[in-house]
Amino acid sequence: LFAEGAEMAHTVLDSVALGYQPVWSRARQLSAVRLAVHVLHPESVDAEHLWRAIGSDWPAAAPTLILAPDTPELIDQALREPPLRNTWLEVPHAWFEAPEGLAQLVEASSKGHQLLRAADLSAVRSEVITPLDVRSLLQLNPNDAWLALRQRNSVELTLSRALLSGQIYAGVASHQLACVCLDEAGAWGLLGWPDEDVLHSHRDRQPQCSNAVIDQIRVGMVAECSIEQLERLVRQDPVLVYRLLALVNSSAYGLQHEIQSLRHALMMLGFTSLARWLREQQAASRVTTSATGAASERGTEDDLHPVRYAMVMRSRLAQHLLESGAEDNLRAEVYLTALFAQLDRLLHEPLGGLIQKLPLSERACDAVLRASGPYHRLLDVARAQGDPPKLSALPAVCDRHEIGLEHANRSLLRMLATSRDYAPTTIAPA
């Protein structure tokens, strides 16, 4: 059921290691994805064939793809190629400072390339005019972070001197700094999200189902969507998926047979019972909100969304790593396995206790609790592709699990091309 590595001469997609990192907007939605390209075999890699493998017509509805090659040779070739739709090309700051490099960037920009300058904030903070008026991906160091947080409440200094508006920031390690960048300094987005600090700041609050996802589900139900569409909506929220499966398998529900799949659970519930249960989840959320203050609801909901959706992206990648001919029920099981493997982070409970409440298959339990079995290798490769700083280790991870590097790279591209973050919808309470 799993793709084998190709035993042939190197092709462009088994000569690079691709990794991804989401960019989150001020609304805490997925606005772009940085695709790191780590070149393994330079003699087999050129921009023309790599661009062709990525696809000349990157979907407009997909998140903007930030192409980030890690060698000067590949960047040089990429600048000479026609631009790909809905993509940006990341170029190191040094290219903008050298006359020859700047001339090449001017020409590439005139041909339609959207350039993203990668620089340290400390190196460009004092510049008056940005070369070519490009957006920048700015790396924060600890001193930058300290300065931004210090100036936030200073009457003598302004925040604009610490951070530049309209840019993408990387290296944001705290929840407070993320809020400063997005809400006060006017950042375009954040590369990555301070998951652990955000989760730590919400550790004393009872985790709730996402109201935004519930609203989307209710819209779909009003429109009489198919069971397949309903399943896609529900599985956007790991907490909602877990609680729904726990509900239908509880003694209170009284079913004689265990329900392992989300689709089966939705069919057993039916629209009427599901709608009633969703109203109960939102009511519980409102009770929690009234106890903590209305102002905290939006912050909790929005700031947790990047954590939840990153889990969804990794689960979808694990699913795509299956062979194209795999059955739907197998794909669904792999998705749930990957989703539940990270559930303890959201629910602040030991993973073993959470999983015991669900009738998961032995393969799923092996992957989640023991890091073993056939599903574990899918989860492990998906994890490695979501860790760009360690992309050099991806070939070894793929070899260990007998998954071809080319297949892993294609799976990642398919996952990203079909990623759609939901737009929050407001519905009058039922």
How does the language model describe each region?
Residues 41-50, 119-125, 140, 222-224, ...:
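Generic structural signal for short, solvent-exposed loop/turn connectors between secondary structure elements
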Residues 1-8, 430:
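Short, low-complexity N-terminal regulatory "tails/caps" that precede and couple sensory modules
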Residues 62, 146-430:
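Conserved alpha-helical "signature site"
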Residues 22, 68-70, 83, 92-94, ...:
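Short, solvent-exposed coil/turn linker segments
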Residues 15-20, 33-37, 64-65, 85-87, ...:
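Generic preference for hydrophobic/aromatic residues in regular secondary structure cores
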Residues 81-196, 333:
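The catalytic core of metal-dependent phosphodiesterases that act on cyclic dinucleotides
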Residues 5-88, 95-99, 104, 306, ...:
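Bacterial c-di-GMP phosphodiesterase EAL domain
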